[in-house]
Amino acid sequence: MISNYEPLLLLVITCCVLLFNFTISSKTKIDIIFAVQTIVFIWFIFHFVHSAI
């Protein structure tokens, strides 16, 4: 279900990402991507294990 605020929220997130893309260094970008992928992987494993039990 799409709420009324979601398009605005997605627009704000997109603008922030574009702003940060030009302001932060490549090493910081790689560190952020690695951290996000790690969090998503841990979340996936957590839910997979709990659905299998």
Swiss-Prot record:
Keywords: ATP-binding, DNA-binding, Helicase, Hydrolase, Late protein, Membrane, Nucleotide-binding, Phosphoprotein, Transcription, Transcription regulation, Transcription termination, Transmembrane, Transmembrane helix, Viral envelope protein, Virion. Induction: Expressed in the late phase of the viral replicative cycle. GO terms for biological process: DNA-templated transcription termination. Disulfide bonds: none annotated. GO terms for molecular function: ATP binding; DNA binding; helicase activity; hydrolase activity. It comes from the Viruses. This is Virion membrane protein OPG141. InterPro entries: Poxvirus_A14.5. It is found in: Virion membrane. It holds the Pfam family DUF1029. One of its GO terms (cellular component) is membrane. Residues 1-4, 51-53 are intravirion. Its main location: virion. Protein probably involved in counteracting host defense, since it enhances virulence in vivo. Belongs to the orthopoxvirus OPG141 protein family. Residues 26-29 are virion surface. It comes from Vaccinia virus (strain Western Reserve).
